[in-house]
């Protein structure tokens, strides 16, 4: 019995161990295959989940942005290369012309020389207006022995040395930005008339025989008569004394590309403007184009040239006109003028006979202009 007891006692632990091993082997697949279930009322969250999501989204956005920019740049480069290769000869020529226009915007020397060039002493006596005339580039008043260059479209005048530097780089007036590139016309008269139509300050002289006439001689085209008529003058305002175009300039100032005005448009603009009669300016244009150097105007003594109305004063002096040519010397003509204040015209005659309508005294012809004479009263 003792032996059986001892054997049975040894058998029991071995059996227990074997049974436990079987139970473990049976429970292992079931434990790994099951999922942990949470109660429906509770949610399991981790504190680091939002930060991870935000960082991931940022990285994705940055990646797509960099990739998109690189792709767009590569595609644009390929498209530009293909368009250049597909361009025709006409397109290439147009691109070359456009590049040349952008690089060379100034006027050439021949175009600059077509602008009238003269001495200030030659036009000082016949210009319209009072006060000195200044150069807008160097802001110096003109002297009698200085060479000036006139811009025909706007009648602004500058020193030839000052404005030539500007014109070599630009094709506009340095003061008002007027375009100086005009189509060359065959007839000089037509070209000068196209210029004169843009200037509001010049006094036009009519070609009507009743108001004046331009005489031609076999030796030269001389300026025989200058018409200053009150009917051709820009109307003035009775209250302010300013002309209509000056009032318009005050109310509506010129706007420039840089957003500022170069000068004040009211009275300061007259300092840089040389206003001449149409006949004188036409003669300047002809002389500058034919002779190709400094134009020489006939010396004329001005009588009371400071008045804007352009009325001729009491001096009835002869106007000697003459110009030297390369071939021969021109004759000097002396003209005597008779004035008819009833018709407001100037008539020229080569005879010594006095006209019938000549006023008997100086005061007879100046009575209507007594208000313009500040110091003298009749």
From Swiss-Prot:
Lineage from the top down?
Answer: Eukaryota, Viridiplantae, Streptophyta, Embryophyta, Tracheophyta
Q: What is its EC number?
A: 2.3.2.27
Record protein name field: E3 ubiquitin-protein ligase ATL9
| SMART domains listed in its UniProt record | RING
Enzyme class, one word?
Answer: transferase
Q: Where is the signal peptide?
A: 1-33
Query: Any keyword Plastid?
Result: no
The UniProt entry's GO biological process terms, in alphabetical order, are:
defense response to fungus; protein ubiquitination; response to chitin
Which species is this record about? Arabidopsis thaliana (Mouse-ear cress)
